[in-house]
């Protein structure tokens, strides 16, 4: 416990006592307040008190918002107008949502990390250059992060695709980059496909991205997004290997 100083907020107290302003949400969630009067008693939680997200009244739900391409106007299911995207991000900020990385969310599902009550995850599939043009400035302004799932055959494939240099720069800026297969094909086992055929195909679709991540980003990709969200037990077995 401590006593607030003039001008103290959850973020300033988190900086002082937890070494990270980004942990201000822990103080805010625990105390129910974001600002404090001078001399007010404030409890500083030193560690997570509920990493499971399960409470007497129910359990925590963390929305994952999946985006693909952004542009001047919306078109179809995968191209969203940049103005609409910015509107959605500002809505999240204004309504107290806190964006967490997908890696943090995975740790939460394993009971290893507590998340803010209004946590949300942002992902971008495929690796469109429009992320840098439209999403990046808005996310940086609002202090949000995001996870980009890129497939190898598209990286650096033209002026509409992110390059490895783009991905390296985004990684240093705090954005999470993960694999989305090599070709963006369906990774489920095809009818009539033999064990050997499927193993070879998965070595290409799953193994090559790991090699390319190590070569270009200096690390593997511990998280993989299935193209089209399609999966089966055969795919899970290969991923476990």
Summary of predicted features, one role per range:
Residues 231-241:
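Short, electropositive alpha-helical surface patch
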Residues 7, 18, 30-32, 47-49, ...:
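Solvent-exposed coil/turn segments that connect beta secondary-structure elements
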Residues 81-102:
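Catalytic domains of carbohydrate-active enzymes, especially glycoside hydrolases
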Residues 60-75, 95-98, 108-111, 116-120, ...:
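Metal-dependent polysaccharide deacetylase catalytic core of the NodB/CE4 family, i.e.
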Residues 2-4, 65-66:
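A short beta-strand micro-motif
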């Amino acid at each position: 416990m401590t006593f607030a100083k003039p001008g103290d907020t959850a973020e300033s107290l988190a900086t002082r006592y937890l070494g990270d302003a980004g942990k201000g949400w822990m103080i805010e969630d625990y105390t129910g307040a974001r600002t404090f009067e001078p001399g007010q008693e404030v409890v500083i939680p030193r560690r997570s008190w509920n990493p499971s997200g399960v409470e007497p009244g129910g359990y925590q739900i963390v929305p994952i918002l999946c985006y693909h391409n952004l542009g001047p106007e919306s078109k179809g299911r995968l191209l969203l107008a940049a103005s609409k995207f910015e509107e959605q991000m500002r809505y999240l900020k204004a309504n107290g949502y806190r964006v967490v990385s997908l890696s943090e969310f995975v740790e939460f599902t394993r009971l290893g990390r507590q998340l803010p009550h209004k946590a949300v995850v942002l992902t971008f599939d495929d690796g469109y250059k429009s992320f840098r043009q439209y999403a990046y400035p808005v996310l940086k302004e609002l202090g949000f992060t995001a996870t980009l799932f890129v497939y190898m055959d598209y990286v650096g494939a033209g002026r509409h695709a992110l390059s490895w240099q783009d991905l390296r720069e985004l990684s240093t800026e705090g954005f999470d980059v993960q694999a989305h297969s090599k070709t963006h094909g369906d990774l489920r086992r095809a009818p009539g496909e033999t064990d050997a055929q499927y193993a070879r195909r998965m070595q290409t679709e799953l193994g090559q991205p790991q090699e390319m991540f190590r070569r270009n980003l200096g690390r593997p990709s511990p998280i993989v997004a299935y193209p089209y969200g399609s999966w089966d037990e055969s795919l899970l077995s290969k991923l476990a290997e």
